[in-house]
Amino acid sequence: GFGSGKTEVSVNLTKYLAGIDPIPPAIVDLDLVNPYFRSREAEAEMEAMGIKVIVPRGGNFFADLPILLPEVKGAVESGAGRVILDVGGDSQGARALGSLSDVFPPDGYDMLMVLNSRRPFTGDLAGCCKVMSRIEATAKMRFTGLIANSHMIEETDPEVLWEGYHLAREVGREMNLPLAFLSAKREVLEQMDTTGLNCPILPLTRSMLKPWEKKTGPTGL
C-alpha cells in the first residue's frame, strides 16, 4: 500500500496463521482509506483458505459500521480462532477501534503498530511516539508491540529495511514495547544479509494490487 503497508501485513499474517493455527483466523476490514482488500479476488482467495472475511458490504463505511460491529464482536467473543483487525492509522480508524475496546479483555489482545520509516509523521522517534500516543488515546487501547515494515513501494532495498528495523528498536526502547517481527517483500529479503537482525521475519507476497496493475485478457491468465 501507499502508507505503512499494514493491509499487506494484515493479509499476509492472516494467511500465515491460517497455515499453522488449528482453527483458521478471521480478518476484519476496519480501514476506511484503503478499499483494495475489499476486492472480490482478495476475499475469495482468503475464504478458500478457510479464513472468515468480515468487511463492510455497502458503499458507505460509516453507515455500515453499526452493522459491522456486532459481527466483529461476535467473532472476538466466540473465542474460535484468532481475529485480525486491519485498522486505519488515522483518527477515524482509531475511533472505529475504540468502539470495540470493551470487547477485548485487558490482557487478551495484541495491538501492533506497523511502522514505515519512509512515511511522514513516522520517520523518527518523536513522530512515531506522537502518532502512537494519539491512537492509544482515541482507541482507548494500548499498543503491545511493533512491526518494522519500512518500504518505498518498488524502490525498497535492504538499506530501507535496516533503517526501519533500527527505528522500530528505538521506538521499542522508548515505549517499552517488543518488536514482534520485521516484514518485507520476499524478493527484497532475499537480497538482505540478516546477520544481526534479532527478530522474526514475515515475508510478504503482494496481494493488494491496485486496479491499474491488474492484467486483463488472455495475457493475464
Predicted regions and their residues:
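Conserved catalytic-core segment of NTP-binding enzymes
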Residues: 91-198
